[in-house]
């Protein structure tokens, strides 16, 4: 049995502030240790539950945050950027039985600690077929096309509530309770590691591949915080303006949908001006 862990950082133990997840800051150095602890707890739990292989895919920012030297020696880690499926890279090869979303967070326009969808502030909302979408929701639809179930989700309490919509049977672990976008009641790393390890062990039993789900077409709508970003996004083929700050596109598969979304976010990031956004 092989488990894939998609590891993001905003939903990690102790993380509440932008500097906590911004590579190179003193706070990031401190928080990446707690992030690594969360991931390692999931790794150990999956091995406890009978997994033969566990692959961790780094999914935050530069995708070079986890401390490999502190992970269980049995694990493998995919680190670095420019991956075909980004946050869920590795699911497409046909050998993954279940996936865990560790350190996940709520989506743009939602309540939740450091809530966003791909871009920190420039995107104010994303909708998938009319439903407001977090990264978890988008990624769950991608992995469903490969017959892989989401078996574990960790993050703040809002991220766990969000996961009820896209992975109702998955085990959930709230490592902190949302107070505001930049505040939370946090549990200690020792406590969250124990909770995550226990949940991952139980979640291993949910790692049973199912027939691929072909739920298309998928219409993705994106709202930005500035008009010129919507204009920039229309450079991507198939992306059309639907309002002053909104665009939308339709894809037959989520594989195509997520890759188009990546293209949109890449171009929009380059279009942001330092002073006016």
Predicted features and spans:
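Glycine-rich nucleotide/cofactor/substrate-binding loop typically near the N-terminus or early
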Residues: 37-93
């Amino acid at each position: 049995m092989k488990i894939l862990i998609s590891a993001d950082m905003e939903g990690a133990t102790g993380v509440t502030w932008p500097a906590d997840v911004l590579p190179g800051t003193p706070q990031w150095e401190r928080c990446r240790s707690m992030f690594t602890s969360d991931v390692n707890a999931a790794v150990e739990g999956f091995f406890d539950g009978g997994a033969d292989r566990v692959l961790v895919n780094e999914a935050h920012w530069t995708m070079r945050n986890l401390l490999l030297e502190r992970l269980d020696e049995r694990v493998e880690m995919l680190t670095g950027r420019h991956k075909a499926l980004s946050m869920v890279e590795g699911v497409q090869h046909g050998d993954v039985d279940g996936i865990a979303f560790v350190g996940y967070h709520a989506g743009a326009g939602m309540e939740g600690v450091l809530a966003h969808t791909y871009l920190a502030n420039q995107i104010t909302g994303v909708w998938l077929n009319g439903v407001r979408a977090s990264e978890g929701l988008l990624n769950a639809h991608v992995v469903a096309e490969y017959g892989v179930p989401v078996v574990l989700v960790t993050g703040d309490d809002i991220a766990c509530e969000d996961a009820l919509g896209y992975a109702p049977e998955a085990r959930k672990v709230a490592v902190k309770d949302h107070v505001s976008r930049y505040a939370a009641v946090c549990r200690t790393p020792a406590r969250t590691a124990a909770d995550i390890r226990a949940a991952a062990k139980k979640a291993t039993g949910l790692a049973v591949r199912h027939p691929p789900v072909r739920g298309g077409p998928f219409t993705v709508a994106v709202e930005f915080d500035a008009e010129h970003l919507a204009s920039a996004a229309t450079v991507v083929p198939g992306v059309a303006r639907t309002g002053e700050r909104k665009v939308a596109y339709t894809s037959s598969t989520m594989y195509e949908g997520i890759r188009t979304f990546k293209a949109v976010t890449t171009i929009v990031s380059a279009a942001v001006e330092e002073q006016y956004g």
